[in-house]
From Swiss-Prot:
Intracellular or extracellular location(s): Cytoplasm
Pfam families assigned: PEPCK_ATP
Originating organism: Bacillus licheniformis (strain ATCC 14580 / DSM 13 / JCM 2505 / CCUG 7422 / NBRC 12200 / NCIMB 9375 / NCTC 10341 / NRRL NRS-1264 / Gibson 46)
GO-annotated cellular components: cytosol
Function statement: Involved in the gluconeogenesis. Catalyzes the conversion of oxaloacetate (OAA) to phosphoenolpyruvate (PEP) through direct phosphoryl transfer between the nucleoside triphosphate and OAA.
Reactions that this protein is recorded to catalyse: oxaloacetate + ATP = phosphoenolpyruvate + ADP + CO2
Cofactor: how and how many bound: Binds 1 Mn(2+) ion per subunit.
Stored PANTHER family: PHOSPHOENOLPYRUVATE CARBOXYKINASE (ATP), PHOSPHOENOLPYRUVATE CARBOXYKINASE ATP
Keywords: ATP-binding, Cytoplasm, Decarboxylase, Gluconeogenesis, Lyase, Manganese, Metal-binding, Nucleotide-binding
Entry's family note: Belongs to the phosphoenolpyruvate carboxykinase (ATP) family.
Encoding gene per record: pckA
HAMAP family: PEPCK_ATP
Descriptive protein name: Phosphoenolpyruvate carboxykinase (ATP)
Length: 527
């Protein structure tokens, strides 16, 4: 099947009588309820459930091995190759399947808030609720927008279509397959809506660096007087909490590009975790869940329609999808100047990293590549011990190119714009998990504020002899003792032992990278 056939077949699909094109939010909600795909909750949001898969299926994700891209992609466990022939066969099957549906829902929009770099996208859905999700998460066209000249990237989403691994070359009945040459993403066998969002992010991670734009898995905000800040961090590090600052406007909560003119949101909405969500803790998210929003896998009372955010019956990974303008305190459009401050968040459950450190460019590149946090792994006897976790560039599942490409771009941009980069430990202090305690949120907020406001630029620093990190001796609003992790432990020898253990884990993890020897030498632990 050549690209001409593919385009013609797609056009035939998109002009079929079963196609519902660019439906409004109320119309989509009507369809969802009519088709019993979801229920209306007391806040007016739609709740849908996703069946077997309540999260992404990374082992079922493939990139087509094509002449134009095969030498650029970092093939391996994250970027698994699949042949063009296998893609073409599956494409024809999915197309045939979608043509036979009684209704299809199509959204035409964009990824990328900066008009110079935005990517036109077309999302074709078997489910009306998936189309509402796409409409709220991606960028909705304005009336004055011209029809894009560039061929859109198309998502064909067929959750009820299941692959046959023996025939189709997939690992299971579920598949997420990207073809860069054919500008198409096939999704089947999973109802989890996040696959659409993250597939578009993955392709932006491939396309943007070609335009000298750094794609980033981070949140971003800006102060009243300017001063853009970026927050990187894996799940549980406090990224959402710390970037939702009432004194600062939100640019975006998850995916951004950094171009020669500044930063821009890749999306037009938010996909927020909502396990244990409360109005007191996260008012921005809580109040954004209203008519037009989508709740995914949240338990809802069948009589009152009240969501129970504390109930993880379906999954811990409950989500809310809503347009960014459901939040009051935002930048419109979602574009801002070059960042002044970058914050890497880590929840160190070993309790050995300083609460805040100012990083050199090389240390910033090292910690960006490392993407460290720790998770608490439960054992059968109920004992929980910390485990070091590393996710390259804080977004390992979404990086098609070799990691050093992203790290080198970050290094160049830090140099060009004189950006202050900080590593902030929101994890444990006074000992590891089980003996120490979680870092006070008030102290973390004070440290982040001091970093963003430039108060640490000329502060007196102490250098950690294990990690080589430079930490301020004083931060307004934080006791001095808290700033030196060794001093918070009752046994400094035990602290040193645990710190060396973590430093070795960093070094072990770094062995997987190529072309990074200089970064490790100048930015890694000293032991």
């Amino acid at each position: 099947m050549n690209s001409v056939d593919l385009t013609t077949d797609l056009q035939t699909l998109l002009t079929g009588e079963n196609v519902q094109m660019n439906l409004s939010v109320p119309h989509l909600v009507e369809k969802i309820l009519e088709r019993k795909e979801g229920v209306l909750t007391s806040s007016g949001a739609v709740r849908a459930t996703t069946g077997t898969y309540t999260g992404r299926s990374p082992k079922d994700k493939f990139i087509v091995e094509e002449a134009s891209t095969k030498d650029k992609i970092d093939w391996g466990a994250v970027n698994q190759p699949i042949s063009e022939a296998a893609f073409d066969r599956l494409y024809a099957k999915v197309l045939g399947y979608l043509k036979e549906r009684d209704e299809l829902y199509v959204f035409e929009g964009f990824a990328g808030a900066d008009e110079k770099y935005r990517l036109p996208i077309t999302v074709v859905n078997e489910f009306a609720w998936h189309n509402l999700f796409a409409r709220q998460l991606f960028i909705r066209p304005e009336e004055h927008d011209k029809k894009p000249e560039e061929q859109p990237f198309t998502i064909l989403s067929a959750p009820h279509f299941k692959a046959d691994p023996l025939v189709d070359g997939t690992r299971s009945e579920t598949f997420i397959i990207v073809s860069f040459e054919k500008r198409t993403i096939l999704i089947g066998g999973t109802e989890y809506a996040g696959e659409m969002k993250k597939s578009i992010f993955s392709i932006m991670n491939f396309l943007l660096p070609e335009q000298n734009i750094l794609p980033m898995h981070c949140s971003a905000n800006i102060g009243e007087e300017g001063g853009t800040a970026l927050f990187f961090g894996l799940s549980g590090t406090g990224k959402t909490t710390l970037s939702a600052d009432p004194k600062r406007k939100l640019i975006g909560d998850d995916e951004h590009g950094w171009s020669s003119t500044g930063v821009f949101n890749i999306e037009g909405g938010c996909y927020a975790k909502c396990i244990n969500l409360s109005e007191e803790k996260e008012p921005q998210i809580y109040n954004a869940i209203r008519f037009g929003s989508v709740l995914e896998n949240v338990v809802v009372d069948s009589k009152t329609g009240e969501p129970d955010y504390s109930d993880s019956f379906y999954t811990e990974n409950t989500r809310a999808a809503y347009p960014i303008d459901a939040i009051d305190n935002i930048v419109k459009p979602s574009i801002a100047a070059h960042p002044q401050t970058i914050v890497f968040l880590t929840a160190d459950a070993f309790g050995v990293l300083p609460p805040i450190s100012k990083l050199t460019k090389e240390q910033a590149m090292y910690h960006f590549l490392s993407g460290y946090t720790s998770k608490l792994a439960g054992t059968e006897r109920g004992i929980t011990t910390p485990e070091a976790t590393f996710s390259t560039c804080f977004g390992s599942p979404f990086l098609p190119l070799p990691a050093h490409v992203y790290a080198e771009m970050l290094g160049r941009k830090i140099d060009e714009h004189g950006v202050g980069v900080f590593l902030v430990n929101t994890g444990w202090t006074g000992g590891g998990y089980g003996t120490g305690e979680r870092m006070s949120l008030a102290y973390t907020r004070a440290m982040v504020q001091a970093a963003i406001e430039g108060e640490l630029d000329k502060a007196e620093m102490r250098t950690d002899r294990i990690f080589g990190l430079h930490s301020p001796v004083h931060v307004p609003g934080v006791p001095d003792q808290v700033l030196d992790p060794a001093k918070t432990w009752t046994d400094e020898n035990e602290y040193e032992e645990k710190a060396i253990h973590l430093a070795k884990a960093f070094k072990q993890n770094f062995k997987k990278f190529s072309n990074t020897e200089n970064i490790e030498k100048a930015g890694g632990p000293l032991v």
